[in-house]
């Protein structure tokens, strides 16, 4: 039976139990000693794929560790699970849906049936729609109510309708097309809309309302605010269609808002929000970098899809990263994972990966609804490299928790300034090196002695300068950030998350936990504005409602 119909108890598998024994044997393993003993360790634990280079040699593993982890992947039926996803089986069991974001990057001529219908012609029809719209806007043919060309595009969306597109359009800023600026409006906080609209002119602004249901609270409220602002700035209801388009599966609601049907781009229920940047949700990406570059992004992701499906697990980049995550989360008690990009343009990748990983694998039941017997998804956190060194890297080096990290760095900068990039790259490498090597008591004492400190002061200060080392990390190197390589990088992390969900036996493609807060929020709002008089379900919430009502004016 397919893994999503009869999930396994992973802790009962022979491979899992073998890993538990191996973990005990690895208690005294030292990466420092492993590198000293094996000149080929770097070569044995590194690989290239799809324009990415992965060094995973600075991990608490041996070749036996890798073999045992690959055995685990085989025992959970990972190869069949991969085939199930790519062929359109209903692996999102709780919602009864296939999972086919990978179809969005498949080339023309491919066939893929969902419920007996080949979906690929529709996928490429939408891609052609995107190409046509982007061309009109870039050529100055799409004009606002005053007949001036569009200069600014505002994407109104939240979650997956925002994080992925923002990541890509900012990561590929060096590829930005002249004449059109892209902005993002996500939060329901009025200050965000105020700050954004202050720098826009209604007559040359196009809003994209991105919401599958056309009913997402934050998105709908911001769309209404944009509509009100547009009218107040001199726009008319009759010309509204020039300034609002939509990406939604709810055509009726979008048309009722004032958007013309031909300006509504479809969404499919087999593409989840956090996997949707490859769809029409990526329209702001195409507007920012042009459709040729957008198609390169898709092509890069497709190459990673091919690698994921065909490479042996011990040479498969997403699989190896997933297995290392399981190794640390389930056998070394790691509760979080740091993402550390050493590139200004990649500064938003951590936010995207937070949603991708935590919304996917933040689950506590198996696919059949029974409780899991082991920890699942970790906390994902981090930020831009050098800034982090002067903030939270201290915890990575000398804290009590084991926190694996991914360093991401390009070889070539788009904007070289003197020797800045050489220092940036050096900082990235030295941080991963310091995490691995650490500093022994003897080294700390020798360092202080060389500075001329007396023995009494050395005795006091040396313990504070000891750094445990043996902290694991991966280093992902790209020659230069490009649409193709970025597509491969994001797809790699998508597949990593999926692999971990298969191992744990959970559903990576639903997000029921998000819904409860939305439901309760309606009641809280009604009590805040006085339209509901009964008390909240608990005293804390009611107390905070009372505090607001006693002080808010307006």
Swiss-Prot record:
InterPro entries for the chain: G6P_Isomerase (IPR001672), G6P_Isomerase_C (IPR023096), Phosphoglucose_isomerase_CS (IPR018189), SIS_dom_sf (IPR046348), SIS_PGI_1 (IPR035476), SIS_PGI_2 (IPR035482)
Enzyme Commission no: 5.3.1.9
One GO CC term on file: cytosol
Main location: cytoplasm
Gene3D superfamilies documented for this protein: 1.10.1390.10, Glucose-6-phosphate isomerase like protein, domain 1
Reactions catalysed according to its record: alpha-D-glucose 6-phosphate = beta-D-fructose 6-phosphate
GO MF annotation terms: carbohydrate derivative binding; glucose-6-phosphate isomerase activity; monosaccharide binding
Functional pathway: Carbohydrate biosynthesis; gluconeogenesis; Carbohydrate degradation; glycolysis; D-glyceraldehyde 3-phosphate and glycerone phosphate from D-glucose: step 2/4
CDD domains the UniProt entry points to: SIS_PGI_1, SIS_PGI_2
Subcellular location per the Swiss-Prot or TrEMBL entry: Cytoplasm
Keywords: Cytoplasm, Gluconeogenesis, Glycolysis, Isomerase
Catalytic site positions: 359, 390, 518
Matching SUPFAM superfamilies: SIS domain
One Gene Ontology term from the biological process aspect of the record: glycolytic process
PANTHER family linked: GLUCOSE-6-PHOSPHATE ISOMERASE (PTHR11469:SF1)
Protein role: Catalyzes the reversible isomerization of glucose-6-phosphate to fructose-6-phosphate.
HAMAP family reported in the protein's UniProt record: G6P_isomerase (MF_00473)
Family of this protein: Belongs to the GPI family.
Full protein name: Glucose-6-phosphate isomerase 2
Species in which this protein is naturally found: Pseudomonas putida (strain ATCC 47054 / DSM 6125 / CFBP 8728 / NCIMB 11950 / KT2440)
